[in-house]
C-alpha cells in the first residue's frame, strides 16, 4: 500500500490496524555514465515497496533529495543544506504523527544522509520532550536502516560482485535500479571497468580528479559489471 496512491479514508482505515509507515529516503546525484541520478532514492523505493507489499505496511512518498554537495559539479545533482533537510524531515514526521502514526521507519539509500538523518531524529525527540502535553501523547519512534545493511544483502552483493563492489555507483545498486526500471537501462562503455579510488574535498575537486568517469570516490564500485537480472 502506497500513501500517495491511497485515499484519505484508506489511510484512516489503515491507521485503525497499524501505526507504522515506511519512508524511502535517498538522494539525487550522479552515479556515473550508466547509473541513474535517482539511484540512491530509487533503491530504497523499490525495496521498500516490495517489503510493504509483502508485509502489509504503508509506504510513504520517497524523500528523494538529500546531502549531495560533493556531487554538485555534475549536472543534474540536487542537494539540500543539512538544516533544510532536517527541517523538512521534522515537518514530514510531525505531519504523519498528527494523523496518528507512531512508528516511522526511514529506509535510506545514501550514506551521505546518515549524519543528517540522525540529527533530524534528535530534533524530533527534542520537540516531543519539550512539549508539555507529550506525556499524554502516544510514544513516537523513528528508525533508520540503510538498505544495504538489511540481513543478507552484503553477503549477496559480495557473492554476485566479488571484485569491485565499492561504495558509490556500485554494481549492486545500479542493478537494483535496472531491475526496477528496465526501460531506463544505459549501455555505456566502461573503461576501466573498475573505477579508480581517491579522496575528494569538495564538488569542484571531485570533478577535477574524475572528469570523465565521474561516479567515484573512495572505494567506488565497478558499475560496468551491473545487470538488471541481478537486481
Give short role names for the model-derived ranges.
Residues 1-83, 87-103, 109-231:
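Extended, histidine- and acidic-residue-enriched regions that form the cofactor-binding/catalytic faces
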